[in-house]
């Protein structure tokens, strides 16, 4: 529940997994609450896992020298939120006013979400992509969004956001909306269609082989030396040790056509096993 640490502070937010039957819930405080980056909480909600067992497992991965600055930030965050629940009512009211104004945009559409604090903007059927909207907001308006993909941009809000920040976001989107138009779009579907690549090596075996970099157009029937994927959603097109077939090459070309960032692609080149 990375983006759900704030759920318990107002009834307008979704029910927290911690109150919905989950055994263990991990929340990132820094994503939606006033806490330093890297701070989070692990909740044991049932007796499925004992505290002793959890401490034993965590000791394998956790540092023996924790940051007391981050620990203090967590404690301060919890104190502020518990003692000032009225802030969340103000947050809720400002969000609804902002959402009502955003609904008036002509081309950029505000997509309904369960969490009103998550603003999802659709640019389907418009003359810009989600990636382009993301870059315009960053470069021209100094507004940092959470993420983007071909047709969408997500803005994460928090109880710490100011009215000035909401006004800047609305004015920026209003200006951009006035400069774009509607267009007929041939949609690129990104759903996983369960294409099965031929496996020649295990990933750990591929990692030990010599590799070379070639143009992906010339990589048909070669063996991949690195993961190639689009993020989001992060599902690999090909895994190290798998054969690169026509499907993979066509998908990479399709993603490039829409100016989407393909991880594992470097200036039209990819790494393959040197055979």
Q: In which residue ranges do the predicted regions lie?
A:
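Short amphipathic alpha-helical patches
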Residues: 81, 160-164, 275
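Short C-terminal domain-edge/linker segments immediately following a structured domain
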Residues: 2, 30, 56-59, 150-153, ...
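Surface-exposed loop/turn and secondary-structure junction residues enriched for glycine/proline
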Residues: 8-11, 36, 57, 61-64, ...
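Conserved C-terminal alpha-helix-loop-beta "cap" of PLP-dependent enzymes
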Residues: 103-265
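Conserved PLP-enzyme active-site core in the AAT-like
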Residues: 1-109
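Charge-dense polyanion-binding interfaces
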Residues: 261-275
């Amino acid at each position: 529940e990375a983006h759900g640490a704030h759920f318990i502070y107002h009834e307008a937010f979704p029910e927290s997994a911690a109150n919905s039957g989950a055994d263990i819930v991990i929340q990132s405080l820094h994503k939606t609450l006033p806490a330093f980056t890297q701070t989070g909480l692990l909740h044991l909600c049932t007796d499925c896992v004992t505290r002793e067992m959890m401490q034993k497992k965590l000791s394998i991965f956790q540092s023996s020298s924790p940051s007391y600055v981050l620990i203090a930030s967590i404690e301060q965050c919890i104190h502020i939120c518990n003692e000032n629940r009225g802030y969340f009512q103000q947050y809720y009211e400002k969000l609804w006013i902002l959402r009502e104004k955003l609904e008036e945009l002509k081309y950029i559409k505000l997509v309904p979400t369960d969490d009103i604090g998550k603003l999802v903007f659709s640019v389907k059927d418009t003359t810009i992509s989600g990636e382009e909207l993301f870059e315009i907001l960053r470069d021209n308006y100094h507004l940092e969004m959470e993420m983007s993909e071909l047709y969408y941009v997500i803005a994460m809000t928090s109880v710490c956001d100011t009215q000035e920040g909401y006004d800047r976001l609305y004015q920026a989107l209003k200006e951009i909306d006035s400069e774009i138009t509607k267009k007929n779009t041939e949609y690129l579907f990104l759903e996983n269609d369960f294409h099965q690549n031929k496996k020649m090596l295990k990933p750990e075996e591929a990692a030990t082989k010599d590799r070379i970099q070639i143009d992906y157009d010339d990589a048909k029937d070669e063996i991949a030396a690195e993961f190639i994927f689009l993020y989001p959603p992060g599902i690999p097109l090909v895994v190290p040790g798998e054969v690169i077939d026509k499907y993979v090459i066509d998908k990479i070309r399709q993603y490039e056509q829409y100016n989407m960032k393909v991880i594992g692609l470097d200036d039209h080149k990819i790494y393959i096993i040197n055979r």
